Regions:
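Enzyme catalytic cores with a strong preference for nitrogen-chemistry domains
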Residues: 1-194
Length: 194
C-alpha cells in the first residue's frame, strides 16, 4: 500500500505504508485476516475473487492490483479519496479503464464524496466500474449517487485462459504471500429504485 506525500497530499505525517504480507488478528475471540495480499473467494465456482487496493496504489508504476490479478483476483476494488482538479476525472477514468484492460479484470473505483470536501480539497464522488477496458457504470460527479453494474466474471476467466501471456508472467515469489479467504455465498437480490 502506497502513501502519497506530494502536491496537496501530506499523508505520511499521519500514516505509514502498509506491509505486503498478511497477519491474523484476534478480535472478540475470532481470528480476522489483515494485509495487502488477501484474495476473498465468493461462491462455489471460485470465479469471483476479490482483492483490494487503496487510493494511491492505482497511481503508482507497479500497483498491487498487478500482483492481485496474477494471483487470481478477477475483481479489484479501490477505496479512494481522490480529489478533483482540472482534467483529473478524465485521467482517472482512463487509468481505471486501462488497468481493467491490462489485468483482464473488473475494477471498482470508489472515491470520497462531495460531503467529505474541506476548504483545502474538493471531492467529487467520481465512482467507476470497469470491465476489461470498458466503463460499465460511472457516477455523475458531485452527486454522491450509487453506481452498480454486472461484471461478467465468466468472460474474464475465459479471456485470461485464452491469453497465452497472462499466466506466464506470474513470478513464483508473488504467490508465496497470498492468502485466499472463502467468504459466504453472495445472494442475488433485486433492487427497487425509487
Amino acid at each position: 500500500m502506497n502513501i502519497p506525500n506530494y502536491a496537496e497530499f501530506y499523508e505520511r505525517r499521519q500514516f505509514k505504508e502498509g506491509f505486503k504480507g498478511n497477519v491474523s488478528v484476534n478480535i472478540d475471540g475470532e481470528d480476522v485476516d489483515f494485509g495487502g495480499s488477501l484474495i476473498c473467494q465468493f461462491g462455489s465456482s471460485n470465479k469471483v475473487k476479490l482483492a483490494i487496493e487503496i487510493c494511491e496504489d492505482l497511481w503508482t508504476p507497479a500497483p498491487p492490483s498487478i500482483r492481485h490479478a496474477l494471483n487470481g483476483a478477477t475483481i479489484i476494488v479501490n477505496l479512494s479519496a481522490s480529489n478533483e482538479t482540472i482534467g483529473k476525472s478524465a485521467y482517472r477514468r482512463e487509468l481505471v479503464k486501462g488497468q481493467s484492460a491490462r489485468l483482464v479484470c473488473g475494477y471498482i473505483y470508489s472515491t470520497a464524496g462531495d460531503g467529505e470536501s474541506t476548504q483545502d480539497i474538493v471531492f467529487g464522488a467520481h465512482n467507476l466500474i470497469c470491465e476489461n477496458g470498458t466503463v460499465l457504470a460511472e457516477a455523475k460527479k458531485f452527486t454522491n449517487e450509487a453506481v452498480y453494474a454486472d461484471i461478467d466474471v465468466d468472460r474474464i476467466c475465459s479471456e485470461r485462459r485464452r491469453m497465452s501471456t497472462f499466466d506466464v508472467n506470474v513470478d513464483e515469489n508473488m504467490k508465496e504471500a497470498y492468502k485466499y479467504v472463502t467468504c459466504p455465498e453472495l445472494k442475488k437480490r433485486t433492487l427497487e429504485l425509487k
